[in-house]
Amino acid sequence: MLQYNQSPHMPQDPSLHSKFQMSSSAPIEISFQMHQEPARNLPFQMCQSPLVIPRSPMQSSHSVPERDLCPQESQGPSGKSSIQMQPGLVMDPALPILRSLLMHSPHQIPSRSSVRAGFQGSLGPMVRSPSYGDRRVSLVTPRKHRKIRTVYTEEQKCVLKKHFHKCTYPSREQRMALAVLVGVTANEIQIWFKNHRAKSKRESLQNVPAALPETNGSSEAVSESVHFPDSLPVVASANGESMWSGTFGEDSIPNLNWSQESSPPHYQACDSARYCPQEYLLNGHAPVTAWNSGQSVAVEVQTGLAVAEAPVVMVASTQGPEYAQDSGPSTEELWQRVLEDFDELGD
């Protein structure tokens, strides 16, 4: 011990020197090797056991991956050596998870701020709606402002109705005078007149449908009260052929069918502007119309105990005015001929 303290390089006995060297200098050399070259044994450790992956705190974060089996040493500013482990063929290809961890460097992992910025960029900027401006939309709907309703007394209503019957659209001066008289504002007077006009119009529309059924009922009553004892429908066709079917009283000729092939040419009983006299219809006589040559007319006279209540139907002839202006026998002569024919057939 004394020799080592004085000069460790003095020649000594080899046996003592070896003992001293084993006891004192060996731990120093081992510790020096462990501190100075901790990474030189890493390739050998990786070759022996590939599952063990040492992580050095001095490993560079900005490294370019290269296909190299040898480690690269670099001297930092502090003078300490640092090793850069590059992914290569040293690792077992059966470990994809470890390989992916080594392939991605720390600067390639996205940070939280970049993820947040990308998320906001995908959504776009939040812009307020131009319809609302700077106001914020609230989920709670605001309550509607209820209008104040003016309540009028009976005296005020009477005054207003009296003026309404005189003038439904009062002028501004009249509204001001009514406002002073009633004790309200001119705007309230205008609102009252507007509402009262709408009310009166609604009531008038409701009364119109109620009046229509009454008029229909009165017309039906009038039509039922009018009664003709013996009525005869008369129908004139467009081509000049006509047919009458009449109902006569009990003293009439029973069930007669009469037809005539030939007839005097061009005459009519009732033209387009003249109706047959009503007295003939009331007396039970049937009028006869004129026909052209070569056309036949069938007159059917039917009798019955009951009196038919049918209105008289007249259809004007569509022949030209020259037929209406032709000269022919009068109506009385025609009736006389018909009665004579009936008497001959009855005998």
UniProtKB/Swiss-Prot annotation:
PROSITE patterns, per database record: HOMEOBOX_1, HOMEOBOX_2
Comp. bias (Polar residues): 72-85
Pfam family, one: Homeodomain
Protein name: Oocyte-specific homeobox protein 6
UniProt organism field: Mus musculus
UniProt-annotated stretches for the region Disordered: 1-20, 54-86
Expression (tissue specificity): Specifically expressed in early embryos.
Family: Belongs to the paired homeobox family. Obox subfamily.
InterPro entries documented for this protein: Distal-less_Homeobox_TF, HD, Homeobox_CS, Homeodomain-like_sf
Keyword rRNA processing carried by entry: no
GO molecular function: DNA binding; DNA-binding transcription factor activity, RNA polymerase II-specific
Outcome of gene disruption: No visible phenotype; mice are viable and fertile.
Protein's job: Transcription factor required for zygotic genome activation (ZGA), a critical event in early embryonic development during which the developmental control passes from maternally provided mRNAs to the expression of the zygotic genome after fertilization.
GO cellular component labels: nucleus
Residues annotated to bind DNA: 145-204
Keyword Nucleotidyltransferase part of the UniProt annotation: no
Keywords: Developmental protein, DNA-binding, Homeobox, Nucleus, Transcription, Transcription regulation
Cellular localisation: Nucleus
